[in-house]
Amino acid sequence: MRNIIYFILSLLFSVTSYALETINIEHGRADPTPIAVNKFDADNSAADVLGHDMVKVISNDLKLSGLFRPISAASFIEEKTGIEYKPLFAAWRQINASLLVNGEVKKLESGKFKVSFILWDTLLEKQLAGEMLEVPKNLWRRAAHKIADKIYEKITGDAGYFDTKIVYVSESSSLPKIKRIALMDYDGANNKYLTNGKSLVLTPRFARSADKIFYVSYATKRRVLVYEKDLKTGKESVVGDFPGISFAPRFSPDGRKAVMSIAKNGSTHIYEIDLATKQLHKLTDGFGINTSPSYSPDGKKIVYNSDRNGVPQLYIMNSDGSDVQRISFGGGSYAAPSWSPRGDYIAFTKITKGDGGKTFNIGIMKACPQDDENSERIITSGYLVESPCWSPNGRVIMFAKGWPSSAKAPGKNKIFAIDLTGHNEREIMTPADASDPEWSGVLN
């Protein structure tokens, strides 16, 4: 693995079978597994502070997943810490901890820290996983996310998603409104702004490597630019001047091409751009609005929405524009489809009308239309819920949620996450209003 912030020095412990059943994240809601994340042993005060902070992040990651219930340290009976001893399992079972995490932090002469952990099954009294990481002090939070990812993967069978980033549009509450592209950790930490707010910006998108983003900027009312920004160097460049574009491009899995929608002559169509040559290729035909394209994980298909039949619905086509198939058949208008990284589901926004007016919904449906035309499932609804995007393991959806103004409070927009089962909806804290989230892949 190249360009990683830490390297694995050794695999400390063998993986054994364990008593806990693997958590199935796709089929309904199960009670969270109780887990004790013990105090990390430390060899000096700096390591002790780092270990304390890492335990908090690991516990928070596991709690936010909705699949684990971290037990308060005030309940712990055994006082020993570290990885050099075998736990007193009866003491952990007494407080109903099915899983136990022990760890230690040591400061190295280089100034880096060596972090080790073990995951124990207290029922079978077996160690499940263990690893040693070397990490610079300023990247301790990423190391904590990596450990939480390992625990999540061992217990669920799916890769974790904690060591990831979110790019989004931040909007000030003051007038005039200032919109800026912002970047943060998946849990809302380490928020920073990437643009200065001098021009309107929309729909940031990660490149495949997650070290670059693309976004739309309205330089003037008539000039719309797509920018590429390198997150490592901070350098920006103009990808193209695309009059009529409304969303930033989405990228092919190989990173060589991107798709976007552009309005021309009264119609909006899907175009694919070769990022090396900057050549555009039109993929859709006819009249109407075709927009919000998203590649399948293998790059062979594209999902998008179109009002060619009068009401916006979802369609799938081959990446060359052939073999168009409609996949949505429910009542209402569909928008913003996003293909799961696993390839099994497509998330979407759906707008329905009732006696109380419009309702916005986030839903998922099977990606293969021949499977079941009635496979659609709504997982959350509200006054304004939109812009769904997937965690890199395809098990969590992040989206924007809005509330109207009232006599008691102004309107607001925030970012939320929810499991694909429709459970565990939670807000991702941002310093200001937020919209248009995009989730990176797991960082290297």
Curated annotation (Swiss-Prot):
BP-aspect Gene Ontology terms? cell division; protein import
Which Gene Ontology cellular-component terms appear in the entry?
Answer: periplasmic space
InterPro entries on file: 6-blade_b-propeller_TolB-like, PD40, Tol-Pal_TolB, TolB_N
Where does this polypeptide localize?
Answer: Periplasm
Q: Indicate whether Ribonucleoprotein appears among the record's keywords.
A: no
Q: Where is the signal peptide?
A: 1-19
**Keyword terms:** Cell cycle, Cell division, Periplasm, Signal
Purpose of the protein? Part of the Tol-Pal system, which plays a role in outer membrane invagination during cell division and is important for maintaining outer membrane integrity.
Q: Which PANTHER family match?
A: PROTEIN TOLB, PROTEIN TOLB HOMOLOG
Instruction: Summarize subunit and interaction data from the UniProt record for this chain.
Output: The Tol-Pal system is composed of five core proteins: the inner membrane proteins TolA, TolQ and TolR, the periplasmic protein TolB and the outer membrane protein Pal. They form a network linking the inner and outer membranes and the peptidoglycan layer.
Would you identify the family this protein belongs to, as annotated?
A: Belongs to the TolB family.
Sorted alphabetically, which HAMAP family does this protein's record hold? TolB
Please identify the protein, giving its name as recorded: Tol-Pal system protein TolB
Species name? Rickettsia conorii (strain ATCC VR-613 / Malish 7)
